[in-house]
Structure formats: C-alpha cells, structure tokens
Amino acid sequence: MMTYMSFEEAIKTLDSGIIIEIEVTPGSRSLSVPSGYNEWRKRIAVKLTKNAQKGKANEQLIESLAELFGISSSEILINSGATSSKKSLLIKGISYQQAVSVLGARLKE
C-alpha cells in the first residue's frame, strides 16, 4: 500500500546536502519519478524504464532526479545501494524544503 502522508521520513539533512532514501523498480513500462512512497520501508518509490545492467538504471535515476530538481546530475551521488534496489542518494544544490516541496507536488498528482 502506498501513501503520501509521511514521505518526508525518506529525506534527511546533512551538512553536505540532503539524503533521499529511494526504492527503485528497474525495467518498468513507464518512467515515474517519484511513483509513490513506501511507508514501511520509509523510501520514495521510483519506476525506471532502463534495466539494472551496466549502471543504466542508476544513470536514468540520477538524470531523472536532476531534471526533477533542476540541478546538474553531478550534484547527485549514490551514497549506498549502487547495486541494490534500495538506494540512498546524496543530493547537493537543493535544500530539504525544496526536496519536500518538489516531491510532495509530484506525489499528489
């Protein structure tokens, strides 16, 4: 079950930027960034059309988030989970409040 009430729990603030906890579904029919919120895992759900081979899904994830937040893809790093569906991303160049605002607007669509 997906809910959008507490998606802020997936976002944390650090001195170097923000961390967003993400759960990726690669090889989906359509690209959906974000596609929902998993309240049990406290992760923003994302659907990617690229398969998880040779970093293609990670590349698509970073490019999609950069476009969503209006920042350079070089400001997004996979902090942990590069080879997992559960990823922790370090994002520079946006504040916690900007992330909540942008993701919240997309999740309510």
Curated annotation (Swiss-Prot):
InterPro entries of this UniProt entry?
A: DUF167, YggU-like_sf
Q: What is this protein called?
A: UPF0235 protein MA_4097
- Taxonomic superkingdom: Archaea
Extent of the signal sequence: none
State the organism named in the record.
Answer: Methanosarcina acetivorans (strain ATCC 35395 / DSM 2834 / JCM 12185 / C2A)
HAMAP family recorded for this chain?
A: UPF0235
Family, per entry? Belongs to the UPF0235 family.
One matching Pfam family, short form?
DUF167
